[in-house]
Design a protein with these regions (language model features):
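Helical hinge/lid and interdomain linker segments adjacent to catalytic or ligand-binding clefts
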Residues: 5, 21-122
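Charged/polar, solvent-exposed surface patches and flexible loops
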Residues: 38, 42, 101, 134, ...
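Short, surface-exposed, polar/charged, turn-prone segments marking secondary-structure boundaries
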Residues: 32-35, 75-78, 137-141, 160-163, ...
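Solvent-exposed amphipathic alpha-helical surface segments
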Residues: 43, 143, 240-244
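An acidic, glycine-rich "communication" segment
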Residues: 1-2, 12-19, 33, 104, ...
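Amphipathic alpha-helical segments in well-structured domains
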Residues: 33, 92, 96, 125-132, ...
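Generic alpha-helical propensity signal that fires on short helical segments
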Residues: 22-25, 84-87, 117, 127, ...
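A glycine-centered loop/beta-turn motif at secondary-structure junctions
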Residues: 1-20, 52, 56, 65-69, ...
């Protein structure tokens, strides 16, 4: 069993509906963790979710309490511009520096793709020059790095049998991803076309990975989310990243 912390994958929404002469507003809150949570439960792991809006109040987190830290669909500004800094101009610890130190001293870390991951929509995720950029096995664009594929794509596996795959043989269909470039010393386990989908490496005393597509809709198609390959992949990633059972 591994202890997993996922930061991100949450959002508020506010809508205006116009019906003829009349209009009204409504809002809500959603999370996008159900598919990962189910996969990790199947693997017997302990899963903790820190929603994006709670980073400002719940950090600092004791990262050593976790075997694997994941960031998904949460931009750099969420970690850097907390009320202490942005509103009151106070100094505080940098969560991204803490994550970088964590992985270099033996922790496991990964970033999952999305509109506010890697470069992100309009470049707003802004991780290209962040404190965690050098811990990831990919080079991140400072610009909008999204590749939208409404027609879908079926990823190819470069290294069949790699422990991070967990035995998965199909990794799609996918409807989009963040375009990344693999670092020289990294292993590209799977690709979307010519672009890395799953990239892994050892960094310092720890391990890190980059998964360029989303862990839920819309980039991950419903048929893939419901497949046994989806759960196999994510449990394989946990096994590889945390070094469970002697994985390579």
């Amino acid at each position: 069993m591994s202890r997993i912390l996922l930061v991100g994958e949450s959002w508020f929404h506010y809508s205006v509906e116009v019906k003829g002469f009349d209009s009204y507003t409504h809002g809500g809150y959603e999370v996008g963790t159900e598919w990962l949570a189910a996969a990790f439960s199947q693997g017997g792991h302990d899963f903790t979710h820190l929603p994006s809006h709670l980073v400002a109040t719940e950090w600092p987190v004791d990262l050593t309490a976790f075997d694997l830290v994941l960031l998904s669909d949460v931009g750099e500004n969420t970690f850097l511009l907390t009320p202490e800094t942005f509103v009151r101009g106070e100094r505080r610890t940098n969560p991204l520096v803490a994550i970088a130190d964590y992985v270099r001293t033996g922790g496991a870390f990964g970033m999952i793709g999305g509109y506010l991951s890697f470069g992100g929509i309009d470049g707003r995720a802004h991780y290209a020059n962040s404190a965690i950029a050098s811990t990831l096995p990919v080079l991140i664009s400072p610009f909008d790095d999204r590749v939208e594929l409404p027609e879908g794509t079926d990823p190819t596996i470069d290294i069949p049998g790699h422990p991070a795959l967990g035995g998965a043989t199909s990794l799609g269909p996918l409807l989009g991803y963040n375009r990344l470039a693999a670092r020289t010393d990294a292993e590209v386990v799977a690709r979307c076309g010519d672009d890395p989908l799953l990239t892994v490496w050892n960094v310092g005393g720890g391990r890190a990975f980059a998964y360029a597509s989303d862990c839920g809709p819309h980039w991950a198609a419903p048929s893939y989310l419901a497949s046994s390959d989806y759960a196999a992949l994510w449990n394989g990633i946990v096994t590889w990243a945390t070094g469970e059972r002697g994985s390579n």
